[in-house]
From Swiss-Prot:
Recorded GO MF terms: lipid binding
Primary location group: secreted
Record localization: Secreted; Target cell membrane; Target cell, Target cell cytoplasm
GO BP, one annotated term: innate immune response
Subunit field text: Homo-oligomerizes in membranes as homodimers, homotrimers, or even homotetramers. Oligomerizes in presence of LPS. In Gram-positive bacterial mimetic membranes, the aggregation is weakly pronounced, and penetration proceeds more rapidly and is deeper than in Gram-negative bacterial mimetic membranes where aggregation is high. Homo-oligomerization is prevented by temporin-L.
Family statement drawn from the similarity comment of this UniProt entry: Belongs to the frog skin active peptide (FSAP) family. Temporin subfamily.
Name of the protein in its database record: Temporin-1Tb
InterPro entries on file: Frog_antimicrobial_propeptide
Documented applications: Has potential application in preventing device infection by S.epidermidis biofilm, since it has the ability, in combination with EDTA, to eradicate S.epidermidis biofilms on silicone catheters.
Taxonomic placement: Eukaryota, Metazoa, Chordata, Craniata, Vertebrata
Expression sites by tissue: Expressed by the skin glands.
Keywords noted in UniProt: Amidation, Amphibian defense peptide, Antibiotic, Antimicrobial, Antiviral protein, Cleavage on pair of basic residues, Fungicide, Immunity, Innate immunity, Lipid-binding, Membrane, Pharmaceutical, Secreted, Signal, Target cell cytoplasm, Target cell membrane, Target membrane
Signal peptide feature range: 1-22
A Pfam match: FSAP_sig_propep
Species of the source: Rana temporaria (European common frog)
Length: 61
């Protein structure tokens, strides 16, 4: 009975570690997918004031 409990505990422990590693890998993949969108937002934030100032100077306002 004691050997069975040790085996089950070991399986549970290894399964928990495996699940944790899978979640970390999935989170890393999601972060990699999110990066281009964040870059686009950063480019828009930098580009919009420049375009706005250019239009103001061209229109003379």
């Amino acid at each position: 009975m004691f050997t069975l409990k040790k085996s089950l505990l070991l399986l549970f422990f290894l399964g928990t570690i495996n699940l944790s590693l899978c979640e970390e890998e999935r989170n890393a993949e999601e972060e990699r997918r999110d990066e281009p969108d964040e870059r686009d937002v950063q480019v828009e934030k930098r580009l919009l004031p420049i375009v706005g100032n250019l239009l103001k100077s061209l229109l003379g306002k």
